[in-house]
Structures are given as C-alpha cells and as structure tokens.
Amino acid sequence: MALHDTYHDPVLAAEVVATLVQRSGIYVDGTLGGGSHSLALLQALQAQGLLESSLLIGIDQDSDALAMAAERLQAWQPYTRLLKGNFRDMASLVQQLCDAEGRACAVTGVLLDLGVSSFQLDTAERGFSYMRSGPLDMRMDNTAPLTAAELINHADEAELARIFYHYGEEPRSRALARAVVQQREKMGNFTTTEELAALVRRLTHGGEKAVIKTLSRLFQALRIAVNDELGALHEVLEGALELLDGNGRLAVMSYHSLEDRVVKHFFTHHAQCDWGPKGVALREPLSQGALTIVTKRPMLASADEIERNPRARSAKLRVAAKNQPKTI
C-alpha cells in the first residue's frame, strides 16, 4: 500500500474547487496533510487550462504528512512547493518563498482544512485517538516539546479543568480534572491513551454513547491545548488576509463549534463596512470591509459523501473573498 493510501479522502473537495479556483495564480494549502485537497486543486487548474501559470504552495508541520504529500504530488512537482511549518506562520513562509524565487507574492486562493487527519487518528503512536492504545502525544508537529502526557501529568487541577471546559466544552470538567490529579497522585503519571480512557470510562455513567461523547470532548481539549490550535487559527486567518490579492479567496473547513465560531466571527468582522460615527446618517459607507462573504451559510457534505466518508459529517466550509482596496 502506498503511503498516501492511508490518508483521508478530501472532504468537500468538489465544493472547495468550485468556490476557490477562479483564475490562475498562487494557491496556498495551509493544511497540506497527505495532499488530497492539493491534488484536487491542481487537477482543477489543469482542467481549466490555468496550471501553467499557477503555483500551489503546501504547508504542514507534520513530517509524516509532508512525506505522503510529496509522494502523492510527485507528478506535479513543477507546479508545487511543499514547506514544513506551522500554518500560523503561513504569511512569512509564503513571503520567504516568493522572495527566494523572485515572485510577486499576491495569493489567489488559500485553503485551510482544520483539525486532526484520519491518518493521525489511525496511527496509534501519535496518541490522538482514545480508540487505540498509544503514547499520550497528540503533537501535530512531532518535534514540538509539549505532549499531552506533559500536560496531563504536570498541569494543576484548575488548569486541567479550564482546558477541559474551554477547549472540550465538557460540562463535568472539574470532576474529571479532580479525578486525573487524584489518580496520578496515587498511581503515578499517565503514559498511554488507554490509561486516560479507562479513567473516563470509570467516571462516566449513561452507557457507551455517553462515554464516547466524554472521551471525544476530553481528547479534543487536550489536542487543542497541546497544539495551541485556536491561537494558531487566529494567526493564520490574519496571515491569509494579508497574503490574498484583491478578489483572492479564503476557504476554511472546520469540524467543531470552537473552530467554526472563530472563522465565522473573523469573516463577519472583516466584512463590516465603516458607516462613520453613530448618529450620522450616510447613504453609503465611508469604506467597505476587507472581505465579502461568499457562503452566507456554511457548505455541508451531502448524504452520499457522508456515507462514503464519515469524517465529512461534521465539516463546515466557509468561503470569503478579499475586496479590492478602495474608498467608496
């Protein structure tokens, strides 16, 4: 089996292509993964006769993902550049590449597919899933210093409760945090996902469905905290807005309410026009917003796609276009 066969099918690929590929230029896949969305973008550019004057830049902090993407996109090498880095640094990474190659750094489209990949979930050694026994790791960048084990074994009860509540929206955050601290004091440090999952199972009543919901919230919270996912998301959205040229588009796919809330607020905030001081009636705004929202409501996967790829069930795709800078 080829490396890329173990990676996920691209979620909402047709919708991404239809909303993002409008013309030739520089396209940035800020969450390259195994390269499945990048491949769909390259194929669309080729089909529309836009490939020869286009470049796709893929960014990922996961070395395994970069290796898989390089294999998948090998035939497209003249039109691709693959970079290792956190997408929060996307603006500087892309600018450095453009400077090195003597390119004008005006980006036509940016894609962000948020969250953990199927490959990462399915690889026990990465420690992302409660369904597989592995080390408590959860790092997107496996060279980063902070692991889930460091967090779960050294954070105090108040900090753990905060993480479980704010990043997992876990209603029993305090009780779970207290139980974690009590167990590590009695039995020593947690080392595996299985040990943490076993504790949650003992504390959760209401059957397997309730257990799975609690485990999902807890593991999500730890993953977000380990990788500072929400902080990185705020930064990459600002970076994407900076990179885009006039009419360039930003497509963001989220998988849980915390991510989607950040994206929705960012789009709404930057789409607002300046109507001047309150109490002054104007027929037209003083200036337009930086963005125009393309998808008034998020695009969702069809029933057919969800049947083929259950990961698509929770996906929400939001797209916005950068306005040409001008004063109205």
Curated annotation (Swiss-Prot):
Q: Which residues of this UniProt protein bind S-adenosyl-L-methionine?
A: G35, S36, H37, D60, F87, D113, Q120
Gene Ontology cellular-component annotations: cytoplasm
SUPFAM superfamilies with a match to the protein in the record? Putative methyltransferase TM0872, insert domain, S-adenosyl-L-methionine-dependent methyltransferases
Q: What is its EC number?
A: 2.1.1.199
Per the record, what are the reactions this protein catalyses?
cytidine(1402) in 16S rRNA + S-adenosyl-L-methionine = N(4)-methylcytidine(1402) in 16S rRNA + S-adenosyl-L-homocysteine + H(+)
Keywords in alphabetical order: Cytoplasm, Methyltransferase, rRNA processing, S-adenosyl-L-methionine, Transferase
Gene Ontology biological process terms, A to Z: rRNA base methylation
The reply on keyword S-adenosyl-L-methionine is yes
Subcellular location, principal: cytoplasm
UniProt subcellular location: Cytoplasm
Q: Which GO terms describe its molecular function?
A: rRNA (cytosine-N4-)-methyltransferase activity
Q: Name one Pfam family in it.
A: Methyltransf_5
Kindly give the Gene3D superfamilies that the UniProt entry links to this protein: Putative methyltransferase TM0872, insert domain, Vaccinia Virus protein VP39
Q: Which NCBIfam families match?
A: 16S rRNA (cytosine(1402)-N(4))-methyltransferase RsmH (TIGR00006)
Instruction: Please state which protein family the record places this protein in.
Output: Belongs to the methyltransferase superfamily. RsmH family.
Q: Which PANTHER family match?
A: 12S RRNA N4-METHYLCYTIDINE METHYLTRANSFERASE, S-ADENOSYL-METHYLTRANSFERASE MRAW
Function field: Specifically methylates the N4 position of cytidine in position 1402 (C1402) of 16S rRNA.
Its recorded name reads Ribosomal RNA small subunit methyltransferase H
Q: State the species of origin.
A: Chlorobium chlorochromatii (strain CaD3)
Taxonomic lineage is: Bacteria, Pseudomonadati, Chlorobiota, Chlorobiia, Chlorobiales
Q: Which gene encodes it?
A: rsmH
